[in-house]
Structures are given as C-alpha cells and as structure tokens.
Amino acid sequence: MSRLTIDMTDQQHQSLKALAALQGKTIKQYALERLFPGDADADQAWQELKTMLGNRINDGLAGKVSTKSVGEILDEELSGDRA
C-alpha cells in the first residue's frame, strides 16, 4: 500500500479533522471518499448494514426474539407470506 503526504497549515489540518469528525469518520476515510466518490455507495451500504445489524443485536439482547424456526422463516419468505 502506498502512502501520500500532503503539507498543509495547522488551520487546514484542524478544518479537515473537524469535517471528518462531523461525519464520524477518520481523516483518511473522509479524504478517500472525497477523492474517490464512486466508493461512497459501497460505504453507505456498509454503514446501513452495520446499523441494521446493531439494531437486530440490541433487539435480541432485549429479549425481542422470534419463536419461529429458521425453516419456518425461510418458508414464509419464499412463499411471499409476510404475517
């Protein structure tokens, strides 16, 4: 992997750091997304997946679980029944 070094003022560095922090990202993540915006869709999908899985995990820990078996859920999904 290659490394890129950019000389900037302390003010520019602080601004870049703040912009990245506002989006919950590292400076590296923020800069790469700005340089290569085509990867943003994949990054957004990854963030959505992490959020969805986090919600599911929290629901499970709170006792909100299904009493159905995996087979029953699969059969429902394949038949289109969404009861």
Swiss-Prot record:
Domain of life where this protein originates: Bacteria
UniProt keyword annotations, A-Z: DNA-binding, Plasmid, Plasmid partition, Repressor, Toxin-antitoxin system, Transcription, Transcription regulation
Gene Ontology biological process terms, A to Z: negative regulation of DNA-templated transcription; plasmid partitioning; protein heterotetramerization
UniProt keyword Repressor, yes or no: yes
UniProt cross-references to SUPFAM superfamilies, sorted A to Z: Ribbon-helix-helix (SSF47598)
Glycosyltransferase listed as a keyword: no
Function recorded in the entry: Antitoxin component of a type II toxin-antitoxin (TA) system involved in plasmid partition. Inhibits the anti-DNA gyrase activity of toxin ParE; reverses and restores gyrase catalytic activity in vitro. The parDE operon alone is capable of stabilizing an RK2-derived minireplicon under defined growth conditions in several different Gram-negative bacteria. It does so by the post-segregational killing (PSK) of plasmid-free cells, also referred to as a plasmid addiction system. Binds its own promoter, autorepressing it; gentically only ParD is required for full autorepression.
Note: Plasmid IncP-alpha RK2 is maintained at 5-8 copies per chromosome.
Protein known as: Antitoxin ParD
Organism of origin: Escherichia coli
